Amino acid sequence: MGQLKQLAGILALASPAIAAFSVYALHDPDALKASLGVTSECLSALNYTVECDGPSAVRATKNSDNDPWSMDDLTTLCTDGCSKSLSTWFDAVEQKCEGEEVTINGLVVDPKAFPMKYISGYDLACLRDSNDNWCFYEAQDWDSGVFTSWDKKQPDACSGENPPADCDKKGSEEDVDTLYVTNSYDKELYCSECFMLLWRQRIESPVFPQGNLLDHFTKQFSKLEAACSTKLPLTTPAPTVVLGAKDTLPPATGYHTDGSTVFRYSSPPAPTITTEEPIAKRTAAPRAMKTFYTPATPDRTPQLGAMAPCGKYYNVVAGDTCASISSEFEVTMDELLTYNPELHPNCENLWANFAICVAPVSPNPMTVDGSCGENNAGATCDGSPFGSCCNNEGRCVPCGPEATAAPDAPDAQGQTVHDDEPPEEPHIEEPPKDIPAGDDDDRKKAKLPLPSGKYPLPSNSTMISKDGSCNEYISCVGSPFGVCCSTSGWCGYGKPWCGVGNCVSGYCDTEDKASGKPQ
């Protein structure tokens, strides 16, 4: 909290927070209270409305080197109002949840863990040196496998649900020597104020993984001080939010850091025995489960942020993990996160008694033989040479009097069949005439200007994506799946979809925007 309050005094940015968020805004309070096992007063504090930009605040908690931030991103998050609001949130939880515990899928959590995680992400992202340089922004240009290995490798390997047995083993002295930070950077860089402030900020964070990793980073900080002939006060926070002293926990409970000092298992998780790669690392598995062409209706409150429409929901029960759900429904962890964007990568917010999306709504396949409808694998007639309407016998026919569907009633594909005149076929926008044939790649890389205000909808002649797939003529803008169509043909937000070279259509980043430099 000391770093946050100090930053609150120096971050005198004029622009206010552009949005606000609360962690459980869309959940039913009674169901959530029963699931978490807390009082109404504590739940109200946990659900405090934080005056920060929500997507940026969540992004900061993930703290990944694979997710580059622009200056606009940082100034959106790092406001004086956001800093003060995070501090107020922590104080409210500390007061209203005193003595309470939150139980989440076998984890016992001190409620303070939730605001502390957001505060820690904010402190790191918004850190500036005495010359007002943004340290986190500058660090994105530093190149070394040592400093970034914690973000890129350690959480994936050692902070997941089933960490390898050697995660807590110390390496040989020879291995340790090769990891000295002073052997990996130029002295001018590692003695810079930003470098040392960032290093200290990480190890002072209450959510930095405890154990050998913290010991190693602390020793490296001492080497930095000695090499740079400087001394910075260092306070390693006591794990005050760990529920029970670590040395009093029975070994069988499997003390679980999960990227934080605030979690422990209330009961040991079932061991996972497999010769395959971790589910999160697998490529897309052939899906044995049914493909869904119509939206499903959940019979429980959906997981916060679950995609809509969703082809299939699964009701989470106590003891489920993301790994077990991924395995059961033959989806990768990346796919599960795509279907449930607000789900944290370490699955700490996977709630029992809520519905999680495990399959998307897929587009109907085009008929190949003139058969159509639900009894024919959901095949659609639209655009087929057999006719664009599906009759009651499951055959494609031309729309009009010869179609057997009831007049002025929707057919199997949702089209209205008239008995007086055939409906007009949907118009697909042709490619621009001034681009010669063969220049498809250049057209895909064309940069569209960034809009001001809300994203305007595409023209009536452009189809809007119904399932997250897209191309030059099926737009993501106006769909719930994103505002950019990537080169892989899927809608989304952020650099993997909107970045220069990654974006086919929609609100693609320009070179200036992608550079992250103020315009």
Swiss-Prot record:
GO terms for molecular function: chitin binding. Its main location: secreted. The keyword Disulfide bond applies. InterPro entries: Endochitinase-like_sf, LysM_dom, LysM_dom_sf. It comes from the Eukaryota. SMART domains: LysM. Pfam families: LysM. It is found in: Secreted. Keywords: Chitin-binding, Disulfide bond, Glycoprotein, Secreted, Signal, Virulence. SUPFAM superfamilies: LysM domain, Plant lectins/antimicrobial peptides. Residues 407-416 have a biased composition (Low complexity). Coiled coil: none annotated. CDD domains: LysM. The keyword Nucleus does not apply. Residues 314-358 are annotated as: LysM domain. Residues 467-510 form the Chitin-binding type-1 domain. Gene3D superfamilies: LysM domain (3.10.350.10). Might have a role in sequestration of chitin oligosaccharides (breakdown products of fungal cell walls that are released during invasion and act as triggers of host immunity) to dampen host defense. The LysM domain binds chitin and potentially related carbohydrates, and might be involved in damping host defense. This is LysM domain-containing protein ARB_03442.
